[in-house]
Amino acid sequence: MTQMTEKKKPLIILTGPTAVGKTAASIGLAKAIGGEIISADSIQVYRHMDIGSAKILPEEMKGVKHYLIDVLNPEEEFNVAVFQKMAKDAMVEIYKRGRIPIVVGGTGFYIQALLYDIDFEKGEENTAYRKKLETYAKEHGAQALHDRLREADPKSADAIHANNVKRVIRALEYYHETGTKISEHNEAEREKDSPYQFAYFVLNDVRSRLYERIDRRVDIMVEQGLVDEVTALKTRGCTREMVSMQGLGYKEILDYLDGKNSLEEAVTILKRDTRHFAKRQLTWFRRERDVNWIQKEEFGYDEEKILQAMLAILKEKEITD
């Protein structure tokens, strides 16, 4: 009975496709409610990776405390389990100060893992089997490995991009160890109720405008020195096998530096791949439950009106007074 009456802790999610304008919206929201921001971005967590990840600048934070930005070196591993633990630790601190955590970023799987407290690591890790799969990927290519996943677990194959070799291996490993599909396990976990009193905002824009913003953002990154940033990482000893270097903007420029493409080709590929990524992000968010879509064009792109709409929803959900 106590559990029924115990008030859940508040949690706000602010997500959306890449380049939609989450950063500016999140600062406005945090200032308005006294919130603190946890980044749900798989690359901004790394030091020395600023331009390619469109990392928020200290002056853009406007005094709002941020977590999970610049906390790992590029050589370190970062995955959904590490994110979940770090984010939970940050939330303990935020609640202690009587503040509300706002999770901001476009990595839907990370957000889902935190929001529903997903236990996705039940399968025991089998290093020998993983090594076998890694060797297979090196010899036959990422696509051939992905085809094996499609045979074992078609739903996971739809959700995981062929180039994301680590996640493909994890899904195959899970199937090998447990005899069940990781997609079915995750589906069951997703059906759980969230332990939080939450609002899940997805900021979105009309496709043509979003794609224009993506193209412009890539051009700005190149102007700001993306090539120099990737060169410095390469000099540091970072390789394409590292999780950090598989991020958009890094692998494409690495190909250019390795003489596989011209800079012009690398930029074209980066724009195309970022648009595809935005499309996949939106597909993911459409599958999620209890989502509040914030269509920017419906508010005439007025940031104040967008903020007021979010504040009204927070009040309605009794997350704020």
Residue ranges and their predicted role:
Residues 1-321:
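Phosphate/pyrophosphate-binding catalytic cores of soluble transferases and nucleic-acid-acting enzymes
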